[in-house]
A protein has these predicted regions:
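Beta-strand-turn-beta hairpins that frame and shape the catalytic cleft
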Residues: 13-26, 112-113, 120-133, 152-155, ...
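N-terminal membrane-anchoring alpha-helices
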Residues: 1-16
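Conserved beta-sheet core of the metallophosphoesterase superfamily
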Residues: 164-241
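Short beta-strand-to-coil "C-cap" segments at the C-terminal boundary of structured domains/repeats
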Residues: 243-245
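Membrane-embedded segments
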Residues: 19-113
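Active-site metal-binding loops of divalent metal-dependent hydrolases
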Residues: 28-33, 61-63, 93-94, 118-119, ...
Length: 245
């Protein structure tokens, strides 16, 4: 038992430089390690990430579960994934207080680049795409101005944000594709209540899959990793997303 599925999206954009045609991005989010996703499923995670054969690995936040858990075990596995363009991550709402520093240190230890309202450039020959990571997307007072606003419309820009709400809450102009998690695909709670509204103020609009904000910008929302069908998942398999540009 590892990951329920690898969900593949082929994304076309006229903005994409020719040399990035076929570029493969693996995206994993919402691990909640040792809360819903434990040590025995780590080999399955590694196998799925390696099978994705990605050029770039992106992490969408919520690494540690409520029960704690030794995050070094999770990050050791992420470190083993071979991706030519490296691994980048953002923080989720569970990375608060002490958790934030624990995750930051694990990222530093394993060479994962944390993007907090920052943009990095990925080069292929003399062409490039831009990767933008959003710092705490729930705090719009501090983080309500998207870093993409200072970029050029002709650039190809990928945004990594923990919650999909961010692409609707604020102006994310110049973004060509956003990747988000947080919703868990609208899992059923222990009490049998549907919980999508708990995860997104927009109800089921940004629940799972490929959606669009009001400006027509595509956002892919993953169900996440830290779930198991025998625990509290119903019809929402855990997944890794594979985006092919």
């Amino acid at each position: 038992h590892g990951i329920g599925r690898i969900k593949k999206y082929d994304i076309y954009s006229e903005q994409l430089p020719d040399s990035f045609d076929g570029f493969r991005i693996a995206f994993a989010s919402d691990f909640h390690y040792e809360s819903r996703f434990g040590k025995k499923r780590l080999p399955g995670l590694l196998k799925a990430l390696q099978a994705a054969d990605a050029d770039l690995l992106l992490l969408g936040g919520d690494y540690r579960g409520r029960n704690g858990g030794n995050l070094s075990e999770l990050f050791d596995v992420l470190y083993q994934v071979c991706v030519p363009y490296g691994t980048y991550g953002v923080m989720g709402n569970h990375e608060n207080n002490a958790n934030y520093e624990i995750v930051r240190q694990e990222m530093e230890r394993t060479g994962i680049r944390l993007l907090e309202h920052q943009v990095d450039t990925l080069w292929k020959g003399n062409q490039y795409i831009l990767l933008c990571g959003i710092r705490n997307p729930f705090d719009l007072t501090k983080n309500g101005i998207s870093p993409t606003l200072s970029l050029q419309a002709e650039d190809y820009v990928i945004m990594l944000t923990h919650t999909p709400d961010y692409v609707e809450d604020v102006d994310v102009s110049n973004t060509d594709l956003a990747l988000a998690g947080h919703t868990h695909g609208g899992q059923i709670s222990f009490f049998g209540r549907y919980t999508p509204a708990h995860f997104s103020k927009y109800g089921s609009r940004f629940l799972s899959g490929l959606k669009y904000n009001s400006a027509g910008i595509p956002v892919i929302i993953t169900n996440g990793i830290g779930t198991s069908r025998k625990d509290i998942r119903l019809f929402t398999p855990s997944e890794i997303v594979l985006v092919i540009l």
